[in-house]
Amino acid sequence: MWEASIAPINKYLADNAGTQLWYGHADMQTGSRTLTTYGALDAFFPGLLALSGDLERARRLQSSSFKMWNLHGIEPETLDYHTLRVANSAYHLRPEIVESTYYLYHFTGDQRYRRMGEKLFNDFVRYCRTDAGYAALADVVTKQQRDEMESFVLAETFKYFYLLFASPNTLDLEKIVLNTEAHPLMRER
């Protein structure tokens, strides 16, 4: 399925806006391009590209994800990448950008991804830490917190932060695969 899908994804959804690589959205019924938005949930894709071996695209898209993060010191739920305006200003403490940072570090050994992860973590703590845990943000521009912390923060976001800074042999990705909830599962051979 991946082999059949990735070429059309790269052909029809990849969008070079300025110097950045982004992936837009399409109507699943017609295939027509619909939006020039990219967001927190899309930030898993650099990691998936890295897992598939396409490190050049993975690096470029991760650079775009990090640019999205740095616009306001934390990523919005959705950004219009053509205008660089926030389309949905919430931040739900999502793991996807950290996940991609981990995979890129794992596959390249490039210290820039640990530095990127350090910035992500420091901003995460600075804007989301509370006396009782971590709080989602209602607005990444104002940094207004909301009384919400989804379970994936502990199950995924912190796990990927840990893995990014742990010894590289903490998980052997030749023997382990992380599922969509970041649970390690033994790979069949």
Locate each region found by the language model.
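Glycan-recognition and catalytic cores of secretory/periplasmic carbohydrate-active enzymes
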Residues: 1-189
